[in-house]
Amino acid sequence: MNAAKVLDDLKRRFPNEPEYHQAVEEVLSTIEEEYNKHPEFDKANLIERLCIPDRVFQFRVTWMDDKGNIQTNMGYRVQHNNAIGPYKGGIRFHASVNLSILKFLAFEQTFKNSLTTLPMGGGKGGSDFSPRGKSNAEVMRFVQAFMLELWRHIGPETDVPAGDIGVGGREVGFMFGMYKKLAHEFTGTFTGKGREFGGSLIRPEATGYGNIYFLMEMLKTKGTDLKGKVCLVSGSGNVAQYTIEKVIELGGKVVTCSDSDGYIYDPDGIDREKLDYIMELKNLYRGRIREYAEKYGCKYVEGAKPWGEKCDIALPSATQNELNGDHARQLVANGCIAVSEGANMPSTPEAVRVFQDAKILYAPGKAANAGGVSVSGLEMTQNSIKLSWSAEEVDEKLKSIMKNIHEACVQYGTEADGYVNYVKGANVAGFMKVAKAMMAQGIV
């Protein structure tokens, strides 16, 4: 495989999709050496087949707002690869959503799901609709209109969506309800469902918890843990909230939290009481993080990211490309020893190079934030066997999965000098499972 040629061909065939190109380039650059050990892969044109999605659905969503005006948004579902299981990946509702972002997320999801060892392929979907500022009735009407098209492309053995940015328990509930009505069946077609209708315990917490479990495995390789460590967290949604919760539980101190308007810096640390306030502010009142600064009298920086503050550990948990090369250099200069990604591809390629050149611990999202989709897979299992596991059972399975992912990364990513390149390890481990499955299934 010539990685540069493959990437040039993709850019020619799919122009104006920078996020997708970035994701493919990052994977190709790390798997090329391992790929070239298998000439049968080239003969089967495997890399091109793996980079291009199986299919992409793009559709108009028309709905009525509370004033009786007709609104139009775009809806998408990218079914990337189902070599090892049904397509699996979230639905994102945000004004920034476009095909490039969803293709990148579906591509990444394929390898992330492979790493979990559970039978799940990769997919992603969403819309440029934003729930922010919309009434509950408007969100429901939009979701129902969205499902009028999506429902025909999904199913428990075909494609199992879940939540993502802008899609929480409320939106998943509306989607599941509409699917149930249209398909006339009650099946595990969605994950992240409410506990009352087939959801799994620990699912809301899973991405944040899983990230910290992975971080703990990394820290063990350096003979340390979270106790007394100062952590920077970006975001204030589901992933950030439960990341903070687990850091507090394990003895660390989180001093930042953010949203799209800016970030707060609380040198005393976000404790349990303050975290409860953030959860209430964000989940119930849909408020802004600056209100935290007003309530607790701490620093609020508008229009900025938290990465200039001093810390031991950085946990980017907001969105893609939120942490650039300059941010990375600031973190390294300030003594940061580890970066573990709760969001999908939050670090730019330049930032990743800075971390790796400095030889600090750096965990890419496809490994570190795989806890969310892992517990989604466990929810699928519970739905299929019509049983419900306890929180303790699910949490133990999550810990085991994250430990196994870490071991796979170390196996494939350890370099000659002993430094673990977790990006390479995650990409090669995830790729090899999918590649072998595709080879075994013929040219399809």
Swiss-Prot record:
<dbReference type="InterPro" id="IPR006096">
    <property type="entry name" value="Glu/Leu/Phe/Val/Trp_DH_C"/>
</dbReference>
<dbReference type="InterPro" id="IPR046346">
    <property type="entry name" value="Aminoacid_DH-like_N_sf"/>
</dbReference>
<feature type="active site">
    <location>
        <position position="124"/>
    </location>
</feature>
<dbReference type="InterPro" id="IPR006097">
    <property type="entry name" value="Glu/Leu/Phe/Val/Trp_DH_dimer"/>
</dbReference>
<dbReference type="InterPro" id="IPR050724">
    <property type="entry name" value="Glu_Leu_Phe_Val_DH"/>
</dbReference>
<dbReference type="Pfam" id="PF02812">
    <property type="entry name" value="ELFV_dehydrog_N"/>
</dbReference>
<keyword id="KW-0560">Oxidoreductase</keyword>
<comment type="similarity">
    <text>Belongs to the Glu/Leu/Phe/Val dehydrogenases family.</text>
</comment>
<dbReference type="InterPro" id="IPR014362">
    <property type="entry name" value="Glu_DH"/>
</dbReference>
<dbReference type="GO" id="GO:0005829">
    <property type="term" value="C:cytosol"/>
</dbReference>
<dbReference type="GO" id="GO:0004352">
    <property type="term" value="F:glutamate dehydrogenase (NAD+) activity"/>
</dbReference>
<dbReference type="GO" id="GO:0004354">
    <property type="term" value="F:glutamate dehydrogenase (NADP+) activity"/>
</dbReference>
<protein>
    <recommendedName>
        <fullName>Glutamate dehydrogenase</fullName>
        <ecNumber>1.4.1.3</ecNumber>
    </recommendedName>
</protein>
<dbReference type="GO" id="GO:0006537">
    <property type="term" value="P:glutamate biosynthetic process"/>
</dbReference>
<comment type="subunit">
    <text>Homohexamer.</text>
</comment>
<dbReference type="InterPro" id="IPR033524">
    <property type="entry name" value="Glu/Leu/Phe/Val_DH_AS"/>
</dbReference>
<keyword id="KW-0521">NADP</keyword>
<dbReference type="InterPro" id="IPR006095">
    <property type="entry name" value="Glu/Leu/Phe/Val/Trp_DH"/>
</dbReference>
<keyword id="KW-0520">NAD</keyword>
<dbReference type="Pfam" id="PF00208">
    <property type="entry name" value="ELFV_dehydrog"/>
</dbReference>
<dbReference type="InterPro" id="IPR033922">
    <property type="entry name" value="NAD_bind_Glu_DH"/>
</dbReference>
<dbReference type="InterPro" id="IPR036291">
    <property type="entry name" value="NAD(P)-bd_dom_sf"/>
</dbReference>
